[in-house]
Amino acid sequence: MILVTGATGKTGRHLTGELVRRGERVRAFVRNPAAAAAALGPEVEIVAGDIDRADTLAAAMSGVDRLYLLAPPSPGLARVEAGALEVARRAGVRRIVKHSAIDAGPAARSSIARLHAAGEQVLAASGLDYTILRGSMFMQNFLLFAESIAVAGEIRAPMRNGRCAFVDCVDLAAVAAAVLTEDGHHGRTYVVTGPEALSGEDAAARLSAALARPVRYVDCMPEETRALLRVQGSPEWMVADMLASIETLAAGEVDQVTDVVERVAGRPPRTFAVFARYAAPLLAAGAPS
């Protein structure tokens, strides 16, 4: 049995589907069981709980031998993951795959990336069979620009000349499924990226082609993005963290391209052009999801 935390998120929903296709028994650990059942289908067992509550997590891990660990971003991320690992150890879970960040490290600009680094250290010292997936920034994040693309034909962000090999969450899920179900990945840290490092202008050009109308990248000041995030209701720590992540991109620190998707999942990663084509209806309608 495989327990998937974050099962209704960008990666989790694709991961559960891929595991079901592989013939695995899958249990989804979620906050909203009704919504999860509708999204994930009848083949997935749904268990309600809170990853920050050891009692509900312990119940969900009964009979589980593999765990996909994705804690929600928060200032308590490292503490939550450490607690989950202890519950997993007591429950007899034998393999853990941790969802981490491409910029994870003790000196990262992003506080969440620093917390992921701390979580990686705890996992590595746990004695459990583990693999760490440092996923690049998602192509799906561009759906956040849906309204500005639909209304003004613009992507506004302070990316400067930075590049990133954005990854489709479908590809990260495919890698996670392979690592959870196949041997040979113990102790590995995989940086999971798309096939090309793109600038804001590159992304805009591919979106223009998919939408058959002009989309341009506008390099704005961080203060503009900060104000927008505040208006959208993001807590202050999240605003600061998102700006730190964008600054990491702008500084050229997440532009590496790896072959992990092809090597581990056994197929080429999706290009941004392919993502743009299937995202085009949402972007044209100004809908973020």
Model regions and ranges:
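Oxidoreductase cofactor-interface core, primarily capturing Rossmann-like NAD(P)-dependent enzymes
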Residues: 2-42, 52-64, 73-82, 86-95, ...
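Conserved SAM-binding strand-loop segment of SAM-dependent methyltransferases
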Residues: 45-48
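A hydrophobic C-terminal alpha-helical subdomain
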Residues: 223-289
